[in-house]
């Protein structure tokens, strides 16, 4: 294969190709094409007033100056939103290391090799922290993950549960409100009922096919759900947990007390 042929496929069309394409659609130039397709009232008649280009160092300094205008305050929102720090080793070796998004390979041109490795590292870390055998490559947020867990558990109902029409999910009352809201939005169209209550008063029944717990809960309390999980499993009821992933570096991971599904929250770094 000639090098110029390979290059032309990646560099794009040349002047001759452009001329052929313009003739095909009935115009003589790109300017005429723009005149006929872009309304005159939104076209800029004078050249863009762009500043002179910056080097990478100059641009980084400029962005840092702009960011310095922001005022960062301590947040007391809670409910999953906490102040965090970014260790220098993470910032340098992950966020500021271009190898994670520039290492392309000939056979995987649409995804960088660095991103694939980062996703594998992420999944490995999630499995280690949660003590779960599998992990996906994350969703939008904890609330979305919890809603997906409910949908998954609904689809995985046993034949007996499907025959009995089991459509109730027990949700502990100390779940984060935003998580409950998204779960409700996703559950209603599927005919799933979310029943909120105290987990210590939960009693399994034929209509309940799954449970969702918060760990730690909205009050900041760290509960031991081992006995609850055993009771649920005895009734063929699956258990999903919405947990703070960072807390699992110290707390007993859900996988060790029998959770079936796990949705986690990764806090933003400041």
Predicted features along the sequence, with ranges:
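Charged, compositionally biased N-terminal leader segments and the immediate start
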Residues: 1-13, 17, 21
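TRNA-binding/sensing appendages of the translation machinery
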Residues: 27-41, 259-260
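N-terminal entrance/gating region of PLP-dependent enzymes' catalytic architecture
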Residues: 36-121, 127
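Structural signal for hydrophobic packing residues in well-ordered secondary-structure cores
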Residues: 41, 63-71, 123, 127-134, ...
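Gly-rich Lys/Arg/Thr-decorated short loops/hinges at beta-loop-alpha junctions or inter-strand turns
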Residues: 97-109, 127-132, 163-166, 194, ...
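Short loop-beta-helix segment that forms the pyridoxal 5′-phosphate
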Residues: 107-111, 128-148
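Positively charged, low-complexity/disordered segments
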Residues: 266-270
